[in-house]
From Swiss-Prot:
It is found in: Nucleus; Nucleus, Nucleolus; Cytoplasm, Cytoskeleton. The keyword Nucleus applies. Residues 107-135 form the IQ domain. Residues 213-231 are annotated as: Calmodulin-binding. Gene3D superfamilies: 1.20.5.190. This is Protein IQ-DOMAIN 3. Residues 23-35 have a biased composition (Basic residues). Residues 326-340 have a biased composition (Polar residues). Its main location: nucleus.
Length: 430
């Protein structure tokens, strides 16, 4: 590199290019001379714009060559100055080294140089480590590290958010499960309470319980048969009189054609048991009261009608005896007054019940004692009832076809016996 540069400088400084440049103008002069001759001969025909352009280009080339020559001379001078400076520096170092350690041997100077070299090596090593630390610090505090740190923090944030959502979902599922188990437990407790309400706490055995249920079923069947028998007889009486009590039909069950009393009795099958001792005592007391009233009525009838041996008097007395209010009729009237009116397919204020009440009041007014004298209206009502003895007998039979109360047994033998006794007494009196 240095040799080529130095050779280039020598060529620039050599006189050969000057001679060539000097030779060239001679040739050109010859050529220019010839051309002038030609130009003169040709009288300006060869002169053209092309020659002008060539001249300009040559001038530019000459200027460039001059500039390059001047630059080469300057660089050569600079190189010579640099070489001289280097030689001078070497001489200065040599002289300074000799003058730095005056009065010392070569061995001491060598040791000093070795120490300085080693110290320089250690200093360069420390400098290299320091540069590494600076470079590491720049890397740590650089943009890449910051970008990595931000991405790591974002990923950690998303991970924490996902963990929180999963934990919240688990808590919600556990709460829903607890609520579901609580509802199932409440439902189970309700079912258990319901089964406990229907539990039979009786100390009876299974056979006894089944026997009681069978007896109840048999009793209900007998009761239904008795009611059906009474209903069939009631239909015959209604067909004969055409004035029976009002029955009510159920559109869903056409065979359910009983009166409201029979249906009320059928709706309460467990209350129609046999007579208890209390009911028996009540029945006996009621019979004694009825017989006492009849015994009081008969002698007073003798005093009231001394001329009662005529057929008309017998005719009037016989219906009176038949229309004596018995215990069953009283119970029917009291039951009709106490029965509520809001039962299905029943009308408490029906026409047959009011007619039965009127007949009962008329019969009761005729069987009063002597100190309660009947009025003219009562006598007229009695005469009207005497005109239709057949209907009064049928109404009495109709009342006797039912039981006196829902808790007592039917009695069909009471009123006919009274009627027979009274008729016998009337015949004896006659």
């Amino acid at each position: 590199m240095g040799k080529s540069w130095f050779s280039a400088v020598k060529k620039a400084l050599s006189p050969e290019p000057k001679q060539k440049k000097e030779q060239k103008p001679h040739k050109s002069k010859k050529w220019f001379g010839k051309s002038k001759k030609l130009d003169v001969t040709n009288s300006g025909a060869a002169y053209s714009p092309r020659t002008v352009k060539d001249a300009k280009l040559k001038e530019i080339e000459e200027q460039q060559s001059r500039h390059a020559y001047s630059v080469a001379i300057a660089t050569a001078a600079a190189a010579e100055a640099a070489v001289a400076a280097a030689q001078a520096a070497a001489e200065v170092v040599r002289l300074s080294a000799l003058s730095r350690f005056p009065g010392k041997s070569m061995e001491e100077i060598a040791a000093i140089k070795i120490q300085t070299a080693f110290r320089g090596y250690m200093a360069r090593r420390a400098l290299r480590a320091l540069r590494g630390l600076v470079r590491l610090k720049s890397l740590v505090q650089g943009k890449c590290v910051r970008r990595q740190a931000t991405s790591t923090l974002q990923s950690m944030q998303t991970l924490a958010r996902v963990q929180y959502q999963i934990r919240e979902r688990r808590l919600r599922l556990s709460e829903d499960k607890q609520a579901l188990t609580r509802q199932l437990q409440q439902k189970h407790n309700k079912d258990f309470d319901k089964t406990g309400e229907n539990w039979n706490d009786s100390t009876l055995s299974r056979e006894k319980v089944e026997a009681n249920m069978l007896n109840k079923q048999v009793a209900t069947m007998r009761r239904e048969k008795a009611l059906a028998y009474a209903f069939s007889h009631q239909n015959t009486w209604k067909n004969s009189t055409k004035m029976g009590s009002q029955t009510f039909m159920d559109p869903n069950n056409p065979h359910w054609g009983w009166s409201w009393l029979e249906r009320w009795m059928a709706a309460r099958p467990n209350e129609n048991h046999s007579l208890t001792p209390d009911n028996a005592e009540k029945d006996s007391s009621a019979r004694s009261v009825a017989s006492r009233a009849m015994s009081e009525m008969i002698p007073r009838g003798k005093n009231l009608s001394p001329r009662g041996k005529t057929p008309n008097s017998r005719r009037g007395s016989s219906p009176r005896v038949r229309q004596v209010p018995s215990e069953d009729s009283n119970s029917i009237v009291s039951f009709q007054s106490e029965q509520p009116c809001n039962r299905r397919h029943s009308t408490c204020g029906s026409i047959p019940s009011t007619r039965d009440d009127e007949s009962f009041t008329s019969s009761f007014s005729q069987s009063v004692p002597g100190y309660m004298a009947p009025t003219q209206a009562a006598k007229a009502r009695a005469r009207f009832s005497n005109l239709s003895p057949l209907s009064s007998e049928k109404t009495a039979k109709k009342r006797l076809s039912f039981s006196g109360s829902p808790k007592t047994v039917r009695r069909f033998s009471g009123p006919p016996k009274l009627e027979s006794n009274v008729t016998k007494k009337d015949t004896n009196l006659a």
